[in-house]
Amino acid sequence: MHQQAATSSRCQGWSPRYQGWSPRFQGWSPRFHGWNPRFRGWNPHCRGWSPCFQGWSPRCQTFPPKINRISSNYPTCDGQEQPAYFTDNFCKPCGVVLQHESERISHFESEIHAQNVKFFFQMHGEQSEVPGRKVNMHAGNSQVCSSGEVNRNNFTDLHNMSFDSLAAAPSHYVGKSHSPTQNQSLEEHDQVSPSTCSPKMDEPNTTPAPPPFLKSVIVKPPPAYRMRTYVCHICSITFTSLHMFRSHMQGTEHQIKRAQHLWTHWQCTQLLESHVINQVKNSKKMQESCQAECGDDIKMKKSRELEPKGHFREMEDNYMEAQAHEYREMVDSRPRHKMLEQTLPLENFWAHPGPYNDSRALEEQLPHNLPAESKTYDSFQDELEDYIKGQKARGLDPNTSFRRMSESYRYRDQRYRERVDSEHRQRPCEERFSFEAPQTYQQEYSASPVEGQSPHWLPSHSKRRNDDFQNEFDDYNKVQESRESEPKTSFRRMDSSFETHNYEEMVDRRSSHTMFEEGLPCETFQTYTDPYSSAQAVENTLPHCLPAYENQPSLDAESHYQLTTEEFSEMPASLSLSQQEDNPSSYNVDYDIYKHLPSNDNASAHETSHRRRRQKRKRHLEEGKERPEKEQSKHKRKRSYQDKDLDKDKLIKQSKREEDKAGVSSEKTKHRRKKRKHETSSEKEERKHKKEKKKSVEERTEEEILWDESILGF
């Protein structure tokens, strides 16, 4: 047998070329799909163990020794048989159900099954010996020495190989397949604990040694239980063998992806560095800007002769001291402001209300932790009493009404302007009067509540707070009655043309009244107080932005009187008979006016009468122009009416013939005619109104337009 094994070593897979196992068969014979029956292999014909060849049959659940197959029918060392781990339909170590014979053969010949079986028996501590197989214990060529060590010349544990010749063992150890597997086994041996790697040598080995195809130095679990993996994180690929992992690391795809990964990593680092550099630069700029702002603030404080505050901690420490200092300055300035208020007139004080309001605002903005203002009050009444006492102690009037001051200021300003205007008008009037009877006029003006008020020269009603419109309206009526002028009860807006017309009449009456006043004594002036009061009331309604033209009405009136007299002298002395017949009432009215007026006021009477005559003449001339137009329109209407009557007769005749058909049409035509009549009449009326408006606009002369522009501003 040994000679046959030596001569036919090729059938075991050993190749002289590769100095080891053939890569094709790895120890298997291509003819019998397993071991050669002549060289301790498998018998393809016999089921089970063949007595001739001392091997397993591939049909009867026999397994090749290369992948560590174990039969289920071999006895243990005690002579007792193990339970059937492997049946025709089930594999217990792998947990697989096998239904067909082809499945059983392919499963039992697989490497996964061999590893699972090996791990299964090693975990349970079960070792067995092939029946009928005896190990020779010779010293020269025995597999196991007396000391228990394995002879490397006859058997290798890494590949589970047995050598029949002495020359085959060194050629195998020097070959390429043994060294990488040995390195891998050493790496895995370092990871496993020594208790599981080497058996205990102190205890005697009662069981016989296992066959060479079942021995292993390192306990390695199968892939089903544990599998060593190698991962490439760049390419995200896993490998089960170290050789494939190393070949992948040296490949071109891995190198390209690695270069891309390094490039992206370098870009990220560059971006981070640039971001950090920009942040540092911005922080430096912010520091410089803050320092510049602090320097500007310190310079400004020095220019204002204040202590510069460069640090925020010092500002926080000195905040209370600065607030207290401002409060003291405000308290010291308030009595001085009170003295100025009493000495200066009210108009100047109201024009500059800033310091007092600023001091009050500062007092309100002060913190409440000052010693003078740190009191707590149980009710509002106590706080109000304390406030009144403090104001009286400072020499100020306590403000007990907490309404908004803007409304009261507006009301005071309006009343004060009215008072000043009335005062300016009364003084020149008093200078014109003679001193023969001054008592009557002193009583008249002393009755008015404008003068003699304290301390701001305002009437008592201006100090009230008008809570609603009714109280304000009552006060207004009282003031107007005290001034002997009719109160204005209608507050609707009037047209601009009407206002300008009233103002022109008012100015004319004032100029005539002043001339009449200079000629008459003071006793007769009392009978003509109504025009003066009405002119004064109207002038109060005018805006106060015309001070430059208040001193020129007398000069403008005299120049206007001279121009009108020249025009009057140039006008024709007599009118035509038709015009005199048309307007006899106008001359009668003018004659009555001359009768009632005295001889000293002839100039003003001529002026007013001349204006009225001129306006009436223009109206009559325009009416004379309109008369032929009206007559023509009347003739046209008569003709249209005659034509319409003829049309009506025709329509009546046609309606008698066709009553049923033309009844509706006749009614429609009647309605259309009525609409046409109304439309023609409305158009004529609109034309008349437009002409009248144009004439009223053209009536104003250039002098009146200049007068309006100079006095009224439009």
UniProtKB/Swiss-Prot annotation:
Q: Which domain of life is it from?
A: Eukaryota
**Principal localisation:** nucleus
Instruction: Give me the stretches of Polar residues compositional bias.
Output: 437-446, 575-588
Q: Region Disordered: which residues? A: 172-214, 417-469, 571-714
Compositionally biased residues, Basic and acidic residues: 417-434, 620-632, 640-662
A Pfam family this protein belongs to?
zf-met
Q: What molecular functions are annotated in GO for this chain?
A: DNA binding; zinc ion binding
Gene Ontology CC: nucleus
UniProt keyword Repeat, yes or no: yes
Q: Tell where it localizes.
A: Nucleus
Q: Which SMART domains match?
A: ZnF_C2H2, ZnF_U1
Reply yes or no: does the keyword Electron transport apply. Answer: no
Mark out the compositionally biased spans (Basic residues).
Answer: 609-619, 669-678
Residue spans, zinc finger Matrin-type: 89-119, 230-254
Q: Which UniProt keywords are present, listed alphabetically?
A: DNA-binding, Metal-binding, Nucleus, Repeat, Zinc, Zinc-finger
- PANTHER family of this UniProt entry? LYSINE-RICH COILED-COIL PROTEIN 1 (PTHR46742), ZINC FINGER MATRIN-TYPE PROTEIN 1 (PTHR46742:SF2)
Q: What is this protein's record name?
A: Zinc finger matrin-type protein 1
Name the species this protein comes from: Mus musculus
What gene is behind this protein? Zmat1
